[in-house]
Amino acid sequence: PWIFTGMAVYQSFISDSKLWETYTIPKAFMVYSIASIVTLFSSGYLVDKFTSRKLIPIMNVPLLLAMVVLFYSKQEFSAYFFLGLIGISNGFGNILGSSTWAEIYGVKYIGSIKALTTAFMVFSTALGTAVFGILIDNDFTIENIAFICGSYILISISILILFRKTLEPIKLEN
């Protein structure tokens, strides 16, 4: 969530950097919303069919692609692709953020697990705003920031792929 929060808070910086009209990103949020809602509906089916453990490594691939779009593209219409891709990742994240924990640890302590993960999520959004602000204050371009975020996402996806097999679901006793 920290990347999306940083992008949302500093959307005027993005627009200015890309020489887009002021309202391009706010208008593109409609695509974000639609992509997020469609993904929310479809990801439940995908979790039931494939399991969260198999899907979680690909959850942030659209976010990685959004950073590639932000890095390379200057055209205003790319804002719609950029936010649409973020919406897809956020839609997956909303479903996988709950179902993964239930799959791995069961539901007995799901309330405590969700409380802890939600606290981390809230902290990460605050951290994202600070990180983006520090980078912008230190003259990082939006392309530099997109590269840093993309690298972080790529490392995260790689770690998930490496460790995914070690997180076996719990066996329920009858």
What are these regions (language model features)?
Residues 54-69:
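Structural signature of the two symmetry-related core transmembrane helices
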